[in-house]
Amino acid sequence: FNDDREFDGFWGIWDEPFLQYMKSVLDKKSTPFLSTIFTVTSHEPYVIPEKYDGQFDKGFIPMHQCVGYTDYSLKKFFEKCKEEPWFENTIFVFTADHGNQTHFPFYEETVNRFANPIMLYKPNRAFKGVDNRLASHMDIYPTIADLIGYDQPFRSWGKSLISDDQQSP
């Protein structure tokens, strides 16, 4: 990505243009592929592009508006990705790199203060709802292995989030 006009002035590139750029990068990959995308708008100082001022709810905490913008950016990303042949056979894993401000007392408790969301999306599989069981970033690897049907032994400290079977470390 080489367009300084899209620099947010703090961390990197605004989410929407960056995700559109990354979609074009994914289009050039041979399958199967693994790719990691890290967006930055939901980090301090919690600002969004000026052209979107007033379009996203400011909510209860400064980060809410940024999350609205990131959500919009992901929607635009997926609208484009759905047109590609690789989309239906792709597993998308969303997670955060750290916890942050909260409006809910549940997350003020010590054990929940470091909570991060993990979301799985696989277009050709029905994942619906919310699972509030304790999970960790360590669980992503065995979950992906489970989703792709990997049936060989492997070492992991985590466990699959879609299976009730326990994987020994």
Enumerate the predicted regions with their spans.
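Solvent-exposed soluble domains appended to multi-pass membrane proteins
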Residues: 1-169
